[in-house]
């Protein structure tokens, strides 16, 4: 006989406790104990409780390998078993007769009656678990999760996603918490009611004037939104949004003018000033290009029975000398030059120039929402999440490292497939390119996607924007990338002693292969790895995954409402075609081109919700679920948190000197995962 003390920790969330009966079986090198009830006098397993139990094993099972946790509803006389009551277990701690503690992290919901098997908390890669019982358990765990979380092809040419139709179909481990879910719907309900009471969601006509638009601008406005309202017509603000707005990933240094963008010296002389030329500035590296060519010929939507229009503009920008502002030099609204595609200039009539800039901003909306936001910052993180759940067991160090960065991602993406990107919902009702345009853009971009785009340092180098001043997305993002990379490198160094150890980890290689096949559709031209051969490659890959799921999403999601609250700054649709000549634009024509009232308010409401985390947040580097139990990774986590705190202090100090602070990549404001 052997006496064990069992300590159990129950989560603190609403509903985490249970009335169900819990027992454990201890599996060792010499056998397995029968189920041992965890039963004290009174109520066990209340939310937030840590409770001790004494259990007696009839025989010595040897060195402990696994813990089987059994949960079943209580049985009442005459009535029989009650309905199962879900339980969130944080961890078990076993104290064997000879002393010492064995910690078994859990951090899972146990919903129905059944058994959950836990391994002692020391992280181990696949080749490090030598005992056949442990090897078998790893395989059985992955088989069960692969049955639970299955792939489906949502749209042709898109990354694959979770095969569930609604959030009601999701199991508790991937659902919003009760508090987060309640806050989300309370926020949505109050905002919808405010718009509805004002009658704005039912008005299908045009805005009467820019002044009338100010009515809607009072809706939940922010300091950044007020700045956009005050400066949206200014060239410097227009250009700055390519650096620090919601789509800071498209601007690139221009070393030569595209043949289909025939800007001349005479056109831009007034901005460049005397003593220079386009060629001189190209050679100096002071010209930049934003090309929305991927939008060329994209399918457009019908809103309120009226066809919408889209453009595929090219915008040439000039970095003023002496750290002056970035300024727009020229805009062409199509990819085909000619008499019907004039090049618009800052010296043109006010309304001609403003209309051209507004067409660029509409292109930014379409590009950002379909690609930068939906594809790169939601669909790809869902791929990383699903592959992690399906291919890495709980005891794998990469599972422990990555699982905090997958929290709620499957819930919010399933919700998006319910409420955003389906017929009759906001993308279909109120955006200029609609669902079909979104789908076509994603299909096009998937064929162009490459690994360097996903790795920030390479992306910055490829676009040639290493030294453009005032590019805070780059500055803050590179600091965070560096902190994540150092953290990941330390963790990888603990568990992978050599390149061969990376190659020999079959679970890691299966994870990478599944991401390549299901996420990137086996496109070798993308440069996305289908296997990893070195520790250096593994560090870069895992850094990319964590950065994409946290900082990248924050940078391109949190500012959506700030940019669109004053709709002319980021119109979701355009109701008249792009101008084919100059000198015809007027204030009335400008307003007639903008989206109707109901579409404006529909999109603003949606982007307000998508910019606002509904509580239950976990900032980057915050890991309350302690999956790692060893001292070495815990020290690395503490160091990572210190680095992030130092980065935050620097960002906040810099922001004190900015008219418009850049806050989207301040670490305390970055969520660990894609959760909204």
UniProtKB/Swiss-Prot annotation:
Recorded name of the encoding gene: ALOX15B
UniProt GO molecular function: arachidonate 15-lipoxygenase activity; arachidonate 8(S)-lipoxygenase activity; calcium ion binding; iron ion binding; linoleate 13S-lipoxygenase activity; linoleate 9S-lipoxygenase activity; lipid binding
SMART domains: LH2
Tissue: Expressed in hair, prostate, lung, ovary, lymph node, spinal cord and cornea.
PANTHER family with a match to the protein in the record: LIPOXYGENASE
Residue span, PLAT domain: 2-124
Domain Lipoxygenase span(s) in chain numbering: 125-676
Sequence positions that bind Ca(2+) 2: 39-40, 42, 44
Binding site for Ca(2+) 1: 15, 17, 85-86
Known catalytic reactions: (5Z,8Z,11Z,14Z)-eicosatetraenoate + O2 = (15S)-hydroperoxy-(5Z,8Z,11Z,13E)-eicosatetraenoate; (9Z,12Z)-octadecadienoate + O2 = 13-hydroperoxy-(9Z,11E)-octadecadienoate; (5S)-hydroxy-(6E,8Z,11Z,14Z)-eicosatetraenoate + O2 = (5S)-hydroxy-(15S)-hydroperoxy-(6E,8Z,11Z,13E)-eicosatetraenoate; (5S,6R)-dihydroxy-(7E,9E,11Z,14Z)-eicosatetraenoate + O2 = (5S,6R)-dihydroxy-(15S)-hydroperoxy-(7E,9E,11Z,13E)-eicosatetraenoate
UniProt name for this protein: Polyunsaturated fatty acid lipoxygenase ALOX15B
Subcellular location: Cytoplasm, Cytosol; Cell membrane; Cytoplasm, Cytoskeleton; Membrane
Metabolic or biological pathway, per its Swiss-Prot or TrEMBL entry: Lipid metabolism; hydroperoxy eicosatetraenoic acid biosynthesis
Substitution effect: residue 39 to A: Abolishes calcium-dependent association with membranes
Any coiled-coil regions, as ranges: none
Cofactor: binding details: Binds 1 Fe cation per subunit.
Signal peptide as annotated in the record: none
Bilayer disposition of the protein: Peripheral membrane protein
Pfam families documented for this protein: Lipoxygenase (PF00305), PLAT (PF01477)
Binding residue positions for Fe cation: 373, 378, 553, 676
EC category name: oxidoreductase
InterPro entries referenced in this protein's UniProt entry, alphabetically: LipOase, LipOase_C, LipOase_C_sf, LipOase_CS, LipOase_Fe_BS, LipOase_mml, PLAT/LH2_dom, PLAT/LH2_dom_sf
Induction: Up-regulated by UV-irradiation.
Cofactors that this protein relies on: Fe cation
Impact reported for residue 602 to Y: No effect on the stereoselectivity of the oxygenation reaction. Completely changes the stereoselectivity of the oxygenation reaction to produce (8S)-HPETE instead of (15S)-HPETE
Protein family membership: Belongs to the lipoxygenase family.
Record comment regarding domains: The PLAT domain can bind calcium ions; this promotes association with membranes.
């Amino acid at each position: 006989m052997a006496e064990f003390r069992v300590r159990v920790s129950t989560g603190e969330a609403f509903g985490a406790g249970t009335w169900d009966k819990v027992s454990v079986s201890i599996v060792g090198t010499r056998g397995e104990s029968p189920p041992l009830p965890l039963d004290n006098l009174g109520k066990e397993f209340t939310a937030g409780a840590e409770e001790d139990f004494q259990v007696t094993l009839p025989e010595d099972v040897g060195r402990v390998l696994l813990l089987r946790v059994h949960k079943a509803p209580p049985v009442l006389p005459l009535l029989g078993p009650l309905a199962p009551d879900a339980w969130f277990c944080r961890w078990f701690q076993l104290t064997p007769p000879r002393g010492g503690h064995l910690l078994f992290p859990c951090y899972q919901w146990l919903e129905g009656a059944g058994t959950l098997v836990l391994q002692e908390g020391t992280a181990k890669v696949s080749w490090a678990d030598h005992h056949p019982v442990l090897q078998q358990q790893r395989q059985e765990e992955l088989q069960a999760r692969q049955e639970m979380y299955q792939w489906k092809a949502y749209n042709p040419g898109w990354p694959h996603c979770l095969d569930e139709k609604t959030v009601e179909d999701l199991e508790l481990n991937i659902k919003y918490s009760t508090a987060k879910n309640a806050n989300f719907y309370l926020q949505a309900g109050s905002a919808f009611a405010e718009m509805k009471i004002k009658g704005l969601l039912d008005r299908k006509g045009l805005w009467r004037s820019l002044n009338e638009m100010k009515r809607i601008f009072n809706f939940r406005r922010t300091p950044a939104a007020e700045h956009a309202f005050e400066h949206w017509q200014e060239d410097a603000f227009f250009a700055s949004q390519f650096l620090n707005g919601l789509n800071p990933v498209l601007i690139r240094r221009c070393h030569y003018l595209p043949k289909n963008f025939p800007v001349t010296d005479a056109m831009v002389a007034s901005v460049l000033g005397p003593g220079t030329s386009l060629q001189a500035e190209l050679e100096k590296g002071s010209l930049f290009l934003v090309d929305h060519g991927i939008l060329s010929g994209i399918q457009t939507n019908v809103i309120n029975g009226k066809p919408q229009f889209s453009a595929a503009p090219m915008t040439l920008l000039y970095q003023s000398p002496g750290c002056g502002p970035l300024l727009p030099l020229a805009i062409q609204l199509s990819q085909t030059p000619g008499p019907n595609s004039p090049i618009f200039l800052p010296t043109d009539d006010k309304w001609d120039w403003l209309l051209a800039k507004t067409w660029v901003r509409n292109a930014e909306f379409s590009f950002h929402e379909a690609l930068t936001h939906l594809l790169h910052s939601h669909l790809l993180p869902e791929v990383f999440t699903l592959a992690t759940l399906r291919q890495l067991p709980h005891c794998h160090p990469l599972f422990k490292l990555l699982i905090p960065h997958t929290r709620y991602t499957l819930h919010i993406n399933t919700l998006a497939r319910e409420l955003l990107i389906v017929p009759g919902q906001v993308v279909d009702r109120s955006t200029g390119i609609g669902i079909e345009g979104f789908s076509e853009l994603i299909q096009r971009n998937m064929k162009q996607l490459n690994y360097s785009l996903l790795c920030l340092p390479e992306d910055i180098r490829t676009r040639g924007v290493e030294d453009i001043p005032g590019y805070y997305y780059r500055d803050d993002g590179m600091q965070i990338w560096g902190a994540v990379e150092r953290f990941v490198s330390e963790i990888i160094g603990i568990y992978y002693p050599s390149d061969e150890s990376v190659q020999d980890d079959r679970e890691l290689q299966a994870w990478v292969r599944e991401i390549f096949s299901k996420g990137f559709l086996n496109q070798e031209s993308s440069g996305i790895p289908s296997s990893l051969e070195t520790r250096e490659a593994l560090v870069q890959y895992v850094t990319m995954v964590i950065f994409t799921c946290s900082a990248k999403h924050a940078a391109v999601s949190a500012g959506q409402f700030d940019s669109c609250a004053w709709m002319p700054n980021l119109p979701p649709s355009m109701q008249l075609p792009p101008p084919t000549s100059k000198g015809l634009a007027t204030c009335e024509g400008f307003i007639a081109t903008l989206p109707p009232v109901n579409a404006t308010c529909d999109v603003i409401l949606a982007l307000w919700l998508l910019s606002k985390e509904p509580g239950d947040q976990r900032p980057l580097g915050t890991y309350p679920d302690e999956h790692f139990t060893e001292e070495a990774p815990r020290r690395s986590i503490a160091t990572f948190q210190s680095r992030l705190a130092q980065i935050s202090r620097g960002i906040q100090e810099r922001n004190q000197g900015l008219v418009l602070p850049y806050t989207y990549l301040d670490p305390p404001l970055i969520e660990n995962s894609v959760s909204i």
